[in-house]
Amino acid sequence: QEYHDFILYWVHEVKTPVVASKMLINNPDLNDTETIFKQIDEELTTIDKLVMQALYFSRLDTFSKDYFIQEQNLGVVVRESVKRHSKLFIGKKMKLDLQNVDMDVRTDSKWLGFILDQILSNALKYTKSSGEVKIWCDTEASEKKVLHIKDNGRGIKEEDLPRVFEQGFTGNIGRQEKKATGMGLYLAKQMAKKLGHEICIQSESGVGTEVKIYFEQKDDYLLIAKD
């Protein structure tokens, strides 16, 4: 049923940028080629994101055959994700505050990169132009390493917070923002769990959102991975 629901969602979502692209191409009132190309490029970026979500969703059931856990420099994975979103950072004139991310953690760089992509995409999407995204790492008293991704965007209403990781849930943002799909955080949560990581969100409407990813110590991680 979960797979069926995802396919229905995916087909519905991917039609939107396809139709938008066709309208841009066939609009006789648009003579500015540069504008057309720019807007079509944005729609293609949306399609690419949806394709990647479908690809990773299809791999959830065979996760054990498609991951490789090893010591990774978190800074490398973070910077690669930031680079993939460079056009959005530049286009919206966003400030990036990147500090103390060069910690070694046990993870799969490919899957963690996808998780970070979902979080960064949301941070950029729901933060106004000239806003700020802060990314840093620290270590808690429990010796767990924590990656923080914080924005000063619109935030999430308190009543929506308990459901943000549910499949297809968009809450108040979904009613205001047509491009909200409710799949990014769901996939991020599922993948984090399979990697032995914990992901949580703190947010205040009108102030911003902070996402935290907790990385277990080596011995604790091995116990979690076995489960």
Go through each PLM region and give its residues.
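Short helix-loop "hinge" at the ATP-lid/N-box region of the Bergerat-fold HATPase_c
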Residues: 123-124
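Acidic ATP/Mg2+-coordinating residue in the GHKL
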Residues: 151
